[in-house]
Amino acid sequence: MNTQILILAISAFLCVRADKICLGHHAVSNGTKVDTLTEKGIEVVNATETVEQKNIPKICSKGKQTIDLGQCGLLGTTIGPPQCDQFLEFSANLIIERREGDDICYPGKFDNEETLRQILRKSGGIKKENMGFTYTGVRTNGETSACRRSRSSFYAEMKWLLSNTDNGVFPQMTKSYKNTKKEPALIIWGIHHSGSTAEQTRLYGSGNKLITVWSSKYQQSFAPNPGPRPQMNGQSGRIDFYWLMLDPNDTVNFSFNGAFIAPDRASFLRGKSLGIQSDAQLDNNCEGECYHIGGTIISNLPFQNINSRAIGKCPRYVKQKSLMLATGMKNVPENSTHKQLTHHMRKKRGLFGAIAGFIENGWEGLIDGWYGYRHQNAQGEGTAADYKSTQSAVNQITGKLNRLIEKTNQQFELIDNEFNEIEKQIGNVINWTRDSIIEIWSYNAEFLVAVENQHTIDLTDSEMNKLYEKVRRQLRENAEEDGNGCFEIFHQCDNDCMASIRNNTYDHKKYRKEAIQNRIQIDAVKLSSGYKEIILWFSFGASCFLFLAIAMVLAFICIKNGNMRCTICI
């Protein structure tokens, strides 16, 4: 009897074997590992690098109005030492300073030098206007062998005012200049510190010297400090240069009685530019927007690990050499063990025994889309990509890199460490600030990429679930989920039927009657098969009970007829 039940169950199951459709996603044999907020080293199908490490060892100047200052220092363009004669006025949007460049000829320095350098780097070039100063009672042709052209000369944009005669009296003078332009004027003047008191008397006469400069926003007095200093360029004296930005319609006044280096022309800034200190060669055949001392960074990535002091439209500098941004779904490739198992199970169970747990295991053969279907029916087996869900995921992931760039993009300026003794403390603060910013942005970069990676993986999983739910809602009671991403269909589903499921045009009512009949038959088989062991044990128990009952009846009859005697001893 039990054997008959088992044979009937197997026969019924073979007769009603269901067609099947499964859902899966794309996988590759070798994915890329990324980090998320919750886990490090997650393997994804696609990822892109966000940290640029490739440097172009040239200054790419194509499309730029570039000026290469050569031996002229940028500050020198405002006062005019001989090496800067050709750059007294210029227009540029890319200014290149060289290591060999020098701002001065007569030894000295600029006050607040680095701030002025930053202003000029962004200036777009400079133009000049004569300030209209005239002098009587003094000489205006002071010159020095430190500033040689064909012979001794002086700064082209400055006047070295001297007494009419050696040791002669230098008169008290006042000069004024009003800025009538619509943009600020850069005004530069100098204070001459003679190599000795005797030299100062010879040049400007005896007595204390005082220079006072004032405008509506500025007032400062200067006294020269004569005395011996180490010789530079054959000179023991020094000239210190000072400057101010004079607003439109404002007036600057100079009151002096010697030791004054007077401005001859005011400088005006032309527009906007980038300035970079570099000895890299100019290349007019490549374009760039981000520069550093070693060349050009050409990149569309949000971060770079090349130089922390790059300027222009640059990726953010971070300490990490690599930060991978996920642009595809989580990847679990079919390894060799899995492929062997797949082959074995196909022989044993067909195509769909190989893709159990489809959400954890992708299909390496699904190359036309990120998501897709595999089916098995009387006509054979097939695989097809689902373009709608793929496109939905792609649309949301496309532009992730650009959005990351928007969050991090900024125009950078270069602040060098060329500070004088008074400014060294400021320089230390700037360096500390720069290091702190790098630390912050290195952390921010890692966090931003991890957030985006988390979102990408969650997004692609969500699209997979949406696709699965779409199929489940269509099939309804006409199919049963097997828990492995597949649906066993309780009716004959040919290729057109499978296509209607994929296209979301499946009509479950059309197949409902056939599906219900097959479901009842299959459920009955499953029920019989499921209770097989219970029936066997029940039959065994009933047989044992029947055997004991017969034995007891026979014993009773024998005792009654005297054929058997039972003696009980106490």
Curated annotation (Swiss-Prot):
Ranges in the topological domain labelled Cytoplasmic: 555-570
Residue ranges of the TM segments: 534-554
Lipid attachment site numbers (S-palmitoyl cysteine): 566, 569
Disulfide bonds, paired cysteine numbers: 22-486, 60-286, 72-84, 105-147, 290-314, 493-497
Single GO cellular component term: viral envelope
Any one Gene Ontology molecular-function term assigned to this protein's record: host cell surface receptor binding
SUPFAM superfamilies for the chain: Influenza hemagglutinin (stalk), Viral protein domain
Top-level taxon of the source organism: Viruses
UniProt keywords, alphabetically: Clathrin- and caveolin-independent endocytosis of virus by host, Clathrin-mediated endocytosis of virus by host, Disulfide bond, Fusion of virus membrane with host endosomal membrane, Fusion of virus membrane with host membrane, Glycoprotein, Hemagglutinin, Host cell membrane, Host membrane, Host-virus interaction, Lipoprotein, Membrane, Palmitate, Signal, Transmembrane, Transmembrane helix, Viral attachment to host cell, Viral envelope protein, Viral penetration into host cytoplasm, Virion, Virus endocytosis by host, Virus entry into host cell
Annotated site (Cleavage): 349-350
General function of this protein: Binds to sialic acid-containing receptors on the cell surface, bringing about the attachment of the virus particle to the cell. This attachment induces virion internalization of about two third of the virus particles through clathrin-dependent endocytosis and about one third through a clathrin- and caveolin-independent pathway. Plays a major role in the determination of host range restriction and virulence. Class I viral fusion protein.
Family according to the record: Belongs to the influenza viruses hemagglutinin family.
Subunit structure comment from the entry: Homotrimer of disulfide-linked HA1-HA2.
More details: Major glycoprotein, comprises over 80% of the envelope proteins present in virus particle.
The name this protein goes by in its record: Hemagglutinin
